[in-house]
Regions:
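Hydrophobic alpha-helical transmembrane segments of multi-pass membrane transport/permease proteins
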Residues: 56-71, 250
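Short, membrane-interfacial amphipathic segments enriched in basic
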Residues: 1-42, 218-223
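Final/C-terminal transmembrane alpha-helix of multipass membrane proteins
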Residues: 229, 235-252
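Short cytoplasmic-facing helical segments at TM-TM junctions of multi-pass membrane proteins
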Residues: 118-143, 226-229
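Loop-to-helix entry region at the N-terminal start of transmembrane alpha-helices
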Residues: 48, 52, 56, 60, ...
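Membrane-interfacial helix-loop-helix connectors in multipass membrane proteins
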Residues: 71-94, 162-205, 209, 213-233, ...
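Membrane-interface helix starts
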Residues: 34-59, 238-241
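Start (N-cap) of specific transmembrane helices in multi-pass transporter permeases
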Residues: 136-157, 232, 236
Length: 258
């Protein structure tokens, strides 16, 4: 009997959290016009979140490009296709690794920062104080951060892919000795702007919505204690990372089936 009661309590808590999340998401989407009219707040968040993650995104992209070029060259060399190295590096980064790895790094860096910021504001009763002063905290605090994250992640993903391609060129052309003309011409001829780059942009936007919303929701729902905020930041990384990987599979399957 106790097991059934605990199970019912867990299901009820899960459904209540799901309902709160759905209401908050709908509210944030509905604030698009209001937040865009006060774009300065959104711009500040894009600047903050972008600067917060730019260094780790750029360095990670460079080393991913190094590894892709090394692995790709020795694999293609077996089949006499080493001139296609540029195409392999570009497609791998633009289609998959750029959006996915950028989103995972964004979740660990900027996502935890958002969760901790909102959680500490809740613990310090700043959100409650704003309510008492007739200032909507969702509109004033959460909304600009939500749209700022959605704008920042595609830009960071583009930086990751560009730096990764540069890293692939450095290893493939300067270190290994692949012909530079073949490297760039294969890339230029084989990468489709709408199908490949467009799909990568769509993925990065979806991941931006997912990671930013998870981070804000966890901070908004965090228990107003130091331990509660700590658990919320940890949960942000876990939930956002799993959501990104799951959505990547779904989006890839949909895009290749069209």
């Amino acid at each position: 009997m106790k097991f059934i009661a605990n199970l019912g309590f867990a299901v009820r808590s899960y459904l209540a959290g799901l309902g709160l999340g759905a209401r908050l998401f709908i509210r944030l989407i509905g604030l698009f016009g209001s937040n865009m009219r006060r774009f300065g707040l959104v711009r500040d968040q894009v600047h903050f979140l972008g600067n917060y993650s730019l260094a780790i995104i750029a360095v990670s992209g460079l080393f991913v490009g190094f590894v892709l070029s090394l692995q790709g060259y020795y694999t293609l060399q077996r089949y006499g296709s080493s001139e296609a190295l540029g195409l392999l590096v570009a497609l791998s980064l633009v289609r998959e690794l750029g959006p996915v790895v950028s989103a995972l790094l964004f979740a660990g860096r900027a996502g935890t920062s958002l969760t901790a910021e909102i959680g500490l504001m809740k613990a310090g009763e700043q959100l409650s104080a704003m309510d008492m002063m007739a200032v909507d905290p969702v509109r004033r605090i959460l909304g600009p951060r939500f749209w700022g994250g959605i704008i920042a992640l595609p830009l960071l993903s583009a930086v990751f892919s560009a730096v990764g391609i540069l890293g692939g060129w450095m290893v493939g052309v300067l270190m290994i000795g692949v012909d530079a003309g073949s490297f760039w011409s294969q890339m230029q001829g084989g990468v489709d702007v709408w199908k490949d780059v467009g799909n990568g942009v769509v993925k990065s936007i979806v991941f931006g919505v997912t990671v930013t919303f998870v981070a804000l929701l966890q901070g908004y729902e965090a228990q107003p204690t130091p331990e509660g905020v700590s658990r919320a930041t940890t949960k942000t990384v876990v939930v956002a990372s799993l959501a990104v990987l799951g959505l990547d599979f779904i989006l890839t399957a949909m895009m290749f089936s069209i």
